[in-house]
Swiss-Prot record:
Intracellular or extracellular location(s): Nucleus
PANTHER family on file: DET1 HOMOLOG, DET1 HOMOLOG DE-ETIOLATED-1 HOMOLOG
Protein name, as recorded: DET1 homolog
Keyword Plastid set for record: no
Organism from which the protein derives: Homo sapiens
Keyword Nucleus: yes
GO BP term, pick one: protein ubiquitination
Disulfide bonds: none
């Protein structure tokens, strides 16, 4: 045996040169069906390699890019108007940065640095329209926006607190027998949903929900699938379904809750004539209805039939044992799986009204067909079957491929590295103190239902292209804890450091007693990102862009 021959061969790193990759693409067609993957690799050569710290911006709250990358929306400082900007491209400020070397333009006081920070925003974003949206004391929710599939319109939400005096009438608060009891943690408000044309800045349509509770933050209470918009009224336990037209108007489709069909009131009136009489005279009090709401009734019927199909007396006894608890369940969250199916999360009223924040509370997931008004399936929040469906078909829950024919959703069902992260998280919970398999399932299913348009499609967050610490930044568009060091992005194929993103200010003493949050907004496909660090009431905006340091 020759001991001089090494048995461990060093890993060969593929050529990272962009010229080499372009030439290889020219002479090699690659495997069938891999064209888009080969093109996407070029993002490892063109990336946001330069950060400008503390960019001056107009007095507004930055929100996000449209899915086609053409527009950027922001909310005015008084949260009554929507500001629509046109994005000018990642090269828009290259002449301003000419001659700058390195990776960071820090918060310096020299004249050129101050000039760059003051002009950078207007170079990248040109203001097109300012649309006055909220009226009657309402304020736009800074974390609520939904873009239509054609990127022509955007839907935003506003709310106004109800005054303590005069108090709303009792039957305005409780409009049916499923209505929940409001409390200071979950106060009632007046809500409005507005749809604005991005091209013209015109306010096209508005829908109002008086004396209600709709969770606007992070789009939790509303969901847009293609042209179908669903809105969950937590207070009235009702789901309102609209169709969004290409012209930007809302068309009433159906209301699900007390009734499932639009003509159910006629059926009830045939049996209870006083219901029809009270409705015509305006004296109807659905809160005192003696019968179970239609949607809840369909849920109970499904569970009873499942107990009958089980064939055992124990299954029926368990149904009777928990019947009262099942009747007290309330809708908390929902999402559209497609144009016809709703995915609804039920839990106790204390959780829905935020009296209890214990995540271990029992809950149920219901799949409901809006057209046939049938409950298709019911899962507990400890269901291994639902977890398997979620892990294998995560993209269908995210609806990640609606805006483009070619997208690369970075989820556990379509990305090996995302799957590894999820398995590592699952194993951590299983092995933790007071953990276990059931607790891990409950924690993973706690992500459902998934809010609409809450994941970034940026290639720089694709775990198959880049490796980064998802503790500081991830594809899910939620604020993260701001770290003390830059976020490093390594090429997945070579392991080489490609670029760093620095959030917050540099050179300032760090107070670890104050929680610092940072929100990232990535362009859908260009090497450009915005980070907004919030510490108490202070906002620091950094731009991360492509800069040729020559």
């Amino acid at each position: 045996m020759d001991h001089h021959v090494s048995t461990i061969k060093p890993r060969r790193i593929q050529n990272q040169n962009v010229i080499h990759r372009l030439e290889r693409r020219r002479i090699s067609s690659g495997k069938a069906g891999t064209h888009w993957h080969q093109v996407r690799v070029f993002h490892q050569n063109v990336f946001p390699n330069f950060t400008v710290v503390n960019v001056e911006k107009p007095p507004c709250f930055l929100r996000k890019f449209s899915p086609d990358g053409r527009y950027f929306i922001a909310f005015s400082s008084d949260q009554t108007s929507l500001e629509i900007y046109e994005y000018q491209g990642c090269q828009a400020a290259e002449d301003l940065l000419q001659g700058y070397e390195g990776e960071i333009l820090s918060n310096g006081n020299d004249q050129r640095s101050v000039n760059i920070r003051g002009r950078l925003f207007e170079r990248f974003f040109v203001l097109l329209h300012i649309t006055n949206v909220a009226a009657n004391g309402e304020h736009l929710n800074r974390e609520c926006s939904l873009f239509t599939d054609d990127c022509r319109c955007v839907i935003v939400g506003s709310a106004a607190y109800l005054p303590d005096e005069p108090h709303p009438p009792f039957f305005e608060v409780y409009r049916n027998s499923e209505s929940v009891t409001p409390n200071p943690r979950s106060p009632l408000e007046d809500y409005s949903l507005h749809i604005i044309d991005l091209h013209t800045g015109r306010l096209c349509d508005t829908r109002t929900f008086k004396c209600d509770k709709v969770v606007l933050s992070h789009n939790q209470g509303l969901y847009l699938y293609k042209n179908i918009l669903a809105i969950l009224s937590v207070q009235q336990q009702t789901i309102h379904v609209f169709q969004v037209t290409p012209e930007g108007t809302f068309i009433d489709v159906r209301t699900i809750g007390r009734f499932c069909y639009e003509d159910d009131l006629l059926t009830v009136s045939a049996v209870f004539p006083e219901v029809q009489r009270d409705s015509q005279t305006g004296m109807a009090n659905p809160f005192r209805d003696p019968f179970i709401n239609s949607l809840k009734h369909r849920l109970l019927v499904y569970l009873w039939r499942r107990a009958e199909q089980d064939g055992s007396a124990m299954a029926k006894r368990r149904f009777f044992q928990y019947f009262d608890q099942l009747r007290q369940l309330r809708m908390w969250k929902m999402q559209l799986l497609d144009e016809n199916h709703l995915f609804i999360k039920y839990t106790s009223e204390d959780v829905v009204t935020l009296r209890v924040t214990d995540p271990s509370q029992a809950s149920f997931f219901v799949v409901y067909n809006m057209v046939t008004t049938e409950v298709i399936a019911v899962f507990e929040n400890t269901s291994d079957e639902l977890l398997e469906l979620f892990e294998n078909f995560c993209d269908l829950f995210r609806n990640a491929t609606l805006h483009s024919e070619v997208q690369f959703p970075c989820s556990a069902s379509s990305n090996n590295f995302a799957r590894q992260i999820q398995r590592r998280f699952k194993d951590t919970i299983i092995n933790a103190k007071y953990g276990g398999h059931t607790e891990a399932v409950r924690r993973l299913l706690g992500q459902l239902p998934i809010s609409a348009q809450s994941y970034s499609g940026s290639p720089y967050l694709d775990l198959s292209l880049f490796s980064y610490d998802d503790k500081w930044v991830s594809v899910m568009e939620r604020p993260k804890t701001c770290g003390d060091h830059p976020i490093r992005f390594y090429a997945r194929d070579s392991g080489l450091l490609k670029f760093e993103i620095q959030a917050g200010l540099l050179g300032r003493p760090i107070n670890h007693t104050v929680r610092r949050l940072v929100a990232f907004t990535f362009h859908p496909f260009e090497p450009f990102a915005i980070s907004v660090q919030r510490t108490n009431a202070e906002y620091v905006v950094n731009f991360h862009m492509r800069h040729c340091c020559t």
